[in-house]
């Protein structure tokens, strides 16, 4: 049985910042997989993805890097265009191609303890697929994709129409401050976390950018600091890197505060370059230690 099974589309991304335009592979699945691959193999990991035939070489490269990848065919690979503001906290998006959604049939062979669902668009994972997976293991969700709908090529923010159905069988959720407000209607992070918990989620993570993050679990809040990077180069995949660090720690029975700090330190290192997390666990620990002196 695999400790963490991450499900999601690998994308082709065109990321534009005030400094540069970079074309690269991306998506929650991609960033989470590479983050796990740079951590000691105490936690077993499998990536389950769908790409168009033209992007099979990307998955082959991941396999050659040592990542366990299961690939299902899709008519197209998702193609995102991300344009970031100067502080990297704001982003506008377009989708130039969409991939096929995941099906229950594709989920049947999987044997994960935790299924991390990396939705990119609102129709990637139906409630039926999530409910089916919840009978096989714990459910961890990155909410971002459920709040995005494509009309033409433009990405429009939407409410999460099936949220109550899906949250009722969700163990862990990660949202940012914008997503929490859309989902709950609440502006206060602590109130929003409590509402998500009331809807059935056991562990709620709210990321607050440079203000850090909060974790709500077992009726208690944990305040997690943000560690300042040496420079901000590219925020793409930062939230996914946080999820990877958190799940890596929690799978080993590590406590919420320590897991949150580990995840935050991974984000700091990720911010300092384009592409997925590529540092060592020693560098992650060094950031935490430096700020706790």
Question: Which residues are covered by each model-predicted region?
Answer:
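Short, conserved phosphate/pyrophosphate- and ester-handling motifs at nucleotide-, phospho-/glycolipid
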Residues: 36, 176, 239
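Active-site metal-binding loops of divalent metal-dependent hydrolases
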Residues: 8-10, 28, 241
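Conserved beta-alpha-beta core of the PfkB/ribokinase-like small-molecule kinase fold
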Residues: 118-194
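Extreme N-terminal starter segment of soluble prokaryotic enzymes
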Residues: 1-5
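Conserved N-terminal subdomain of the carbohydrate kinase-like
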Residues: 12-23, 38-118, 123, 128-138, ...
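Conserved phosphate-binding/catalytic region of the ribokinase-like
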Residues: 156-164, 190-293
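Histidine-anchored nucleotide/phosphate-binding helix
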Residues: 27-38
């Amino acid at each position: 049985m695999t400790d963490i099974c991450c499900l999601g589309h690998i994308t082709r991304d065109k990321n534009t910042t005030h400094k540069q335009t970079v074309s690269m592979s991306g998506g929650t699945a991609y960033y989470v997989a590479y983050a796990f691959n740079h951590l000691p193999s105490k936690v077993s990991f499998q990536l389950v993805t769908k790409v168009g035939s033209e992007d099979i070489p990307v998955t082959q490269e991941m396999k050659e890097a040592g990542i366990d990848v299961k690939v299902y065919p899709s008519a197209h690979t998702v193609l995102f265009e991300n344009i970031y503001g100067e502080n990297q906290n704001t982003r506008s998006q377009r989708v130039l191609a969409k991939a096929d959604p995941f099906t229950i049939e594709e989920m049947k062979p999987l044997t994960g303890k935790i299924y991390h669902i990396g939705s990119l668009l609102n129709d990637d994972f139906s409630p039926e697929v999530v409910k089916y997976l919840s009978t096989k293991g714990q459910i961890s969700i990155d909410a971002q994709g459920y709040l995005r709908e494509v009309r033409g090529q433009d990405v429009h923010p939407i409410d999460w129409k099936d949220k109550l159905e899906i949250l009722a069988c969700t163990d862990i959720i990660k949202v940012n401050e914008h997503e929490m407000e859309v989902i709950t209607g609440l502006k206060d992070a602590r109130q929003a976390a409590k509402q998500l918990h009331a809807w059935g989620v056991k562990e709620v993570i709210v990321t607050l950018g440079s203000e850090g993050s909060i974790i709500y679990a077992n009726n208690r809040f944990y305040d997690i600091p943000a560690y300042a990077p040496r420079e901000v180069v590219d925020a793409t995949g930062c939230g996914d890197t946080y999820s990877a660090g958190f799940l890596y720690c929690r799978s080993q029975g590590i406590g919420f505060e320590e897991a949150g700090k580990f995840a935050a330190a991974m984000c700091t290192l990720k911010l300092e370059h384009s592409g997925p997390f590529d540092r060592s666990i020693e560098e992650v620990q060094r950031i935490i230690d430096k700020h706790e002196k």
